[in-house]
Structure formats: C-alpha cells, structure tokens
C-alpha cells in the first residue's frame, strides 16, 4: 500500500477498505443516542483494550460479548463501513469507538448527552506500536525505517493526522461532565482503579468483585488468548502476525510532561523533539 492510495477525508488520511466515502457519509449522518458511550483514541492508544472494557462495564461483568462477538462488531468504529451492518444488533447502551478528531463528529453527537472516554497515550509508545502495526498490516503504507516513520509522525503524515491536533481537538471541546480523560499508562499501572473511574463515570455501581473480574479478563494474557479480541480471525492477507504480534506487551518508555502541562517531549536517542506547538 502506498500513501497515494490512502483515502483523504477533509484532509484526514484514512486507509481504504474499512473506510469508504459511503461509510464516512453514514458516520456524519449517524443518529447518536443519549445513552451512547464513545471510546475516543488516536490510533494505537488503547482502542482494542477499550473494546474489551466497555462491554464488560456496561454489562456489569457479563463475559458473553467478549467471548462470542469479535471486538469490531461488539464495539464498532463510527467511521468504518462495518457499523452499518451491525448497528441494529447493538444493545443499549451502545459502545462505539472512533479515531475522529472532535470536529469530525456528527452533528447529532454534539446535541446529544452521549458520553466520551478519551484515552491518551505516551506518544513514543504510539510511534513504536504504530511502526510495528504498519509492518504487519498489508493495507497500510510501508513504514520504512523507524527514523523515517518518526519524521512522518511529527509531520502528521500518518493515519488520522497529527497526534497533537487530535488531542487538542478533544481537550478544547466543551463537553463538561460528558467526557472522561484517562491515560493508557494509568490503566497499565493500576487497571482496577482505572476501571473504577470508568464505571463511576458511566454511572455503574460495580462491586469490587466485578471490577476484579473485569480486570482479569482485560489483562494482556487474557486478551492475547481470546480469539474474539486478538485479531487472529483476520486473514493473513490483511495482517501478517508472523511479522509482528498485534497485542504486544507494553514495556514503558522515556517520556515526560513539563510542569506547565502544555509541552510533550519525545526522546529519540539523544534528540529531544517538541511535539506540542
């Protein structure tokens, strides 16, 4: 796949196949319900993890959805063509995911009471995860060397554009108590506490026992063994897991946020690159 073959939607680069002009039009005309819950992420920031977490929290620990329904059907992407095929099968409250920046959300979202869980992730981890994903996904551009891929990332010449623009669009959205910001890192460090924050935000009074059950079933080990979640159902012609595993255990990286909370730095060898501008 070459960059020239990516679908350009209002300046946003998207991979063809899963995204079509029709699916994007459907997303813009989508009727958002007040009870809908959106997990919003920049690519490679915990989307699949949230597709595991959301149905378990919304269904108070019932494992049936995550054991019987592929993650892309149980919590579908707003912008992908699959949504049209499964939307009528989604139970209420509906869980959905999207990589859209805020300004790309449908008008019905902005007039609804739908809630958003925005998952933020260390940008260096995003780059590394995305780099490996590009190596295994045949529908994406060849990433080249890691140095070249970092340059593309900083330029926004990657799926869904610049990370900083995505993050700022949601940080600046005036959604009040409709949005919860949570980090991938706090989920890694203490998943039960993160699940408690999510369940409280969604108005679920889950017991400690249910929280532990959800945490156990959303662990790296459990998800890696779950065919409904590890993307092993996707044909090799689209994802070659011999080149890289889709679920890769997070090892942590060198990053920091300045005391002003407005600048992020990315350590690339001895080089520091400012990402927030």
Regions inferred by a protein language model and the residue ranges of each:
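Short, conserved secondary-structure transition motifs
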Residues: 77-78, 218-225
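A generic structural signal for alpha-helix starts
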Residues: 45, 186-189, 205
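C-terminal, well-structured subdomains that either form a transmembrane helix-short loop-helix hairpin
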Residues: 183-194, 198
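PAPS-dependent sulfotransferase catalytic domain
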Residues: 1-182, 195, 209, 228-277
């Amino acid at each position: 796949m070459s960059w020239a073959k990516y679908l350009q939607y209002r300046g946003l680069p998207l991979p063809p196949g899963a995204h079509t002009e029709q699916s994007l039009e459907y997303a813009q005309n989508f009727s958002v319900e007040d009870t809908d819950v959106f997990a919003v992420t920049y690519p490679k920031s915990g989307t699949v993890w949230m597709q595991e977490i959301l149905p378990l929290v919304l269904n108070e620990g019932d494992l049936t959805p995550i054991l019987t329904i592929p993650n892309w059907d149980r919590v579908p992407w707003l912008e992908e063509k699959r949504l049209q095929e499964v939307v009528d099968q989604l139970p209420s409250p509906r869980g959905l995911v999207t990589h859209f920046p805020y300004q790309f959300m449908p008008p019905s979202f902005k007039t609804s009471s739908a809630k958003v869980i925005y998952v933020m992730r260390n940008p260096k981890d995003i780059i590394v995860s995305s780099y490996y994903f590009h190596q295994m996904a045949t529908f994406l551009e060849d990433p080249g060397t890691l140095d070249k891929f970092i340059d593309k990332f900083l330029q926004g010449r990657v799926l869904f554009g610049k990370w900083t623009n995505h993050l700022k669009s949601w940080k600046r959205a005036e959604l009040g108590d409709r949005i919860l910001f949570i980090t991938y890192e706090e989920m890694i460090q203490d998943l039960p506490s993160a699940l408690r924050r999510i369940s409280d935000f969604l108005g679920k009074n889950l017991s400690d026992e249910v929280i532990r059950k959800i945490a156990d079933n959303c662990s790296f080990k459990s998800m890696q063994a779950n065919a409904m979640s590890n993307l092993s159902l996707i044909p090799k012609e689209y994802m070659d897991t011999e080149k890289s595993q889709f679920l890769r255990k997070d090892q942590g990286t060198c990053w920091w946020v300045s005391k002003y909370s407005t600048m992020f730095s990315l350590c690339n060898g001895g080089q520091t690159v400012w990402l927030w501008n």
